[in-house]
């Protein structure tokens, strides 16, 4: 068992429990807790997101073998947004409104998260977002479980600027034309300015 899987096993049940206790959508009379899984199983993001779906199914199965959670069995409801950003919003609405999930684990890219955010806020759903993100967003309907630039990119730059990191003086900020790199590079550029680095 790798370290990441071990950490996920230790934290998924408490995270789900905390999320469910905070969520107004939990049906106290139901015998099951429905968990939405909103990860691409086809398209360009399937190579990354299928692993997350498989991990969630494994963790749900293991938790059910231990008697479930809060005295209830966990039931996975899996949908495939097919790496299609508008379809993410449609599938999120389906999970919350039609399938009546209590909590959802999903999305990978920032654009998929931004696509579903209005749906989760409108329907008062709860989303656990599993990867690093660019920050500059906060919602009571989302648990952002990954690092933001101030927790990841800025410490890396500080290290590279230090003597131990090589005392870097010149910087080139690269990235694809996409939400995460654009926003992270904007944050890093401002940070570098505070350290006296010129454009």
Question: What name fits each language-model region?
Answer:
Residues 25-29:
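Sec/Tat signal peptide C-region and signal peptidase I cleavage site
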Residues 32-40, 74-78, 169-172:
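Short, well-ordered beta-strand elements
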Residues 12-24:
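Bacterial N-terminal signal peptides
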Residues 2-15:
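Bacterial N-terminal signal peptides that target proteins for export
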Residues 86, 101-199:
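Extracytoplasmic ligand/sensor domains, especially the bilobed periplasmic-binding protein
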Residues 73-98, 152-155:
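Structural motif
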Residues 30, 54-76, 166, 194-198:
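Signal peptide-proximal N-terminal region
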Residues 36-55, 79-86, 108-111, 176-182:
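Extracytoplasmic "Venus flytrap"
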């Amino acid at each position: 068992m790798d370290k990441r899987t071990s950490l996920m096993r230790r934290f998924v049940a408490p995270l789900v429990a905390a999320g469910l206790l905070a969520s107004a959508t939990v049906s106290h009379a139901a015998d099951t807790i429905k968990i939405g899984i909103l990860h691409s199983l086809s398209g360009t993001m399937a190579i990354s997101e299928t692993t997350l779906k498989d991990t969630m199914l494994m963790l749900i199965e293991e938790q059910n073998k231990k008697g479930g959670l809060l005295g209830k069995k966990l039931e996975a409801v899996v949908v495939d947004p097919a790496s299609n950003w508008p379809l993410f919003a449609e599938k999120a609405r389906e999970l919350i409104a039609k399938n009546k999930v209590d909590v959802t684990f999903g999305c990978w890219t920032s654009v998929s998260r931004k696509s579903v955010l209005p749906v989760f806020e409108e329907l008062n759903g709860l989303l656990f977002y599993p990867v690093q993100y660019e920050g500059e967003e906060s919602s009571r309907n989302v648990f952002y479980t990954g690092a933001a630039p101030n927790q990841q990119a800025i410490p890396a730059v500080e290290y590279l600027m230090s003597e131990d990191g090589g005392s870097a003086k010149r910087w080139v900020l690269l990235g694809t034309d996409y939400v995460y790199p654009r926003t992270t590079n904007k944050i890093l550029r401002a940070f570098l300015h505070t350290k006296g680095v010129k454009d």
